Amino acid sequence: MKKILILIAFIPVLAFSQGYKKHTLQKDKLSITLTEGVLNITPLTDKAIRIQWQKELAVEKEEFVLVNKHAIPAFKVTETPAKLNLSTKDVVVSFDKQTGALSYSNSAGKVFLSEKANSRRLTSATVMDQPCYVAEQGFNSPKDESLFGLGQFQDGQYNLRNVSRKLIQVNTQIAIPFLYSSKGYGILWHQYGLTYFNPADNSIALTKKEAGAVQTRDVEVTTTSGTQKVSQQQSLYSGNFKLDKPGDYTFMLDLGNMDNRHLLIIDGVAKIDQSNLWLPPAVSKIVHLEAGEHTVQVLCKASNKPALTWKIASDESVFRSPNAKSLDYVVFYGKNADEVIADYRGLSGNVPMLPLWAYGFWQCRERYTSGTHLVETIKEFRKRKFPVDVIVQDWQYWGKYGWGVPKFDETNYPNPEQFIKELHNLNAHFSVSVWENLDKKSDVAKPYLEKNLYLANSPWIDIFNPETQRTHWNALNTNLFSKGVDSWWMDATEPENDALADKQTYFGPGDFYRLTYPLFVSKAVYNGQRTADPDKRVTILTRSAFPGQQRYGIINWSGDIGSNWDVLKRQIVAGLNYNLTGMPYWATDIGGFFRPGRGQYTDEKYHDLLTRWFQWGVFCPIFRIHGYQTETEPWKYGEKVEANMRNMVNVRYRLMLYIYSAAWDISKNGSTLMRPMVMDFSADEKAVQQPYQYMFGKELLIAPVTEANTTEWEVYLPKTAGWYDYWTGKRYAGGQTIKAAAPQDRIPVLVKAGAIIPMAKEMQYTGEKPLDTLEIRVYKGDNGSFNLYEDEGDGYHYEKGSYTLIPFSWNEKTQTLSIGARQGTYPRYLKSRVFNIIMVKENNGVGVAEGKAFKSVVYTGKVLNIKV
């Protein structure tokens, strides 16, 4: 930070170095020569514009994100005495010759984004003795703008306008430098290294108290060497600062390394207070303060060195990357978030379909200890009629082979092919944990060592090297995939604890590529499996991500989080912002990873939390339970909890066709399943600001309960033609806040008027029963439509058109349900089936129970019109 602050002192001088000299129109871009360097404006699509400013250093040669090359869109350049304008069909980029700033407007001439004048900067720096720049760009941000995205963070900040962010990859935090605005645009800050958003440059001097060790305690932590008991000492720091005027101020507390406590006290009041065995190094908060003197206190691990910085809220958003080769960003514009994200994915990689079973229930714990343990657990699920599709083997199955070695120790897993076959015979799929820091003393590591494929002085492999990727996949294929493993749990892919800083990689200094390690881990596995078995869809659960990673069949989860109501609330916010970065598949450890020990099985307070968390998990893109040193099987918590969980799992499986059709919408059209309210109700400001509710698909509004002992819950219903309570059928007008019933057995779920929801039968696993009879629930009150998508459930034949679509539409004026002609075929598709048409009303067509049909029709693929 000191280096950055010193360099910033020269910024006023540098600003004059961007004076306009001339411009050149090239086939694919407009190049503007400045007093220093060249500014390139490149239209990538009609709605996506790439900006690159380069000076003396060569630009980054490796293209990690924007891998899909499109035809050059039609564009023209016009000039006035004051401006240069580059226009595509949908966007106009204007360059101000006097200030050098860019502004962006739509085809109607409305400006939706503009750079702040004199805020574009490339300041000379070095990293690992190699020259680089501190790249910085400021954008004007009007007061009525809301900003979302940047990945998954644990501080509970939803609207990111004026929030400071330190984008690094660590456990529980995922850094994705993609920002979405309520104004209808997205920005990909195209840097691969450490990035700050709204950097706070005013430092507060902190003094460590003489009696600094205020607490010493022994805790168990998960580490790259397994579970360890460590003694942790905490220190108290204090300081003071003075403000010249009242206002909102953003604070960033950066502890330097992972910690177990975020405690910031300002004027005797705790403004940030979070505890967990793993917390990211940096945390942020916006605080309103009056002018004058203020005091601060910070508590952290004694081994950490806290830095506290602040800035006053302003009408500007800033990106800064301290290890850059050029300034590089892409602006995406659209009528809505779906258009923005679809265009972004079109350039960075579309999302492949996951197998049907991946949308079912995942049973996971830390940990199963043998092949027999896994098989017997699935047998118990089947015996208890509790639906499940996936069981997961966590770490340490490697035993004698050494830490992180992807190979089953025969002591407890004597015949991997056999126990995995037994799981398959029980109609379960198997996922296994894999790490990228396998023990160098193991036989499996020999090829890595012989080819020098580890990072120097590090336990982590250099996954950037194509040879490492091939070698790594060969190890996974030989020892795991060939034995029958169905999917991958790629753990600690940050790599853990921000391990690339100051490390040399295949591409060069790791600081340049500090955020991208997880991208290459997923690439290695995805490409390897698709080559080894093109008929088996790749499914990768991974703890970290970077732009473009969505093209590799990934799911993220929120890492090793704690288990209390505040943590639950913060996961909702974390997930919503994550999903607005174009990454559609996400989950949490239902119930929290770090749990309250043996008492959790009988503690009714914890049961309340677990039950509510599980109910929310039903409506997450991926539905997975997990816990540290915990038997997470539902029956361990007693009959009441098990019964509630079973009922909610049945809801998930009855909605499976709705979910799978939404998955197709993701892959085909660039849609999103877990949808922050800004995606569908951007004109409703009250809806946009709701941090704890969202749309699941485009028809279901989900409002998780995040407080103990609750029987009703406030839900804001956006301004539409109306809403139905999913559980009761009661209808509500839009544009109001209601108190929805929230008894212990359910959370509020509202259905948008005009929705058409297909309901499958209850099943013990996906594909258990033929879908020859479906319930079609129609929610009158507005026009609506739905496309029912089906395919083989696995494999990639859908990429070549092997699937069916059945279009449904409801006409409110004529009170007619139309079922269109079936489009397409795939092997063994149903040529004839029964649709039970349910006109939803109070106490009919509600919840998990089957409704009373208004009419039953036999559908053979031909058009049907059903008049109500």
Where does each model-flagged region fall?
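Bacterial Sec-dependent N-terminal signal peptides
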Residues: M1-K21
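A low-complexity, Ser/Thr/Gly/Pro-enriched, surface-exposed linker/loop concept
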Residues: Q18-H23, K27, T42-N85, R121-A125
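Solvent-exposed beta-strand/loop surfaces of large extracellular or lumenal domains
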Residues: Y20, E60-K76, L263-V283, K451-Y454, ...
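Short, well-ordered beta-strand segments enriched in hydrophobic/aromatic residues
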Residues: I32, I41, I51, L86-V93, ...
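Conserved, mostly hydrophobic/aromatic
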Residues: I41, D90, F178, F381, ...
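Catalytic and substrate-binding clefts that recognize carbohydrates or anionic sugar/phosphate headgroups
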Residues: E79-M353, R365-E366, G371, I378-K383, ...
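Catalytic core of carbohydrate-active enzymes
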Residues: N527-G528, D535-V538, A545-N556, Y578-T588, ...
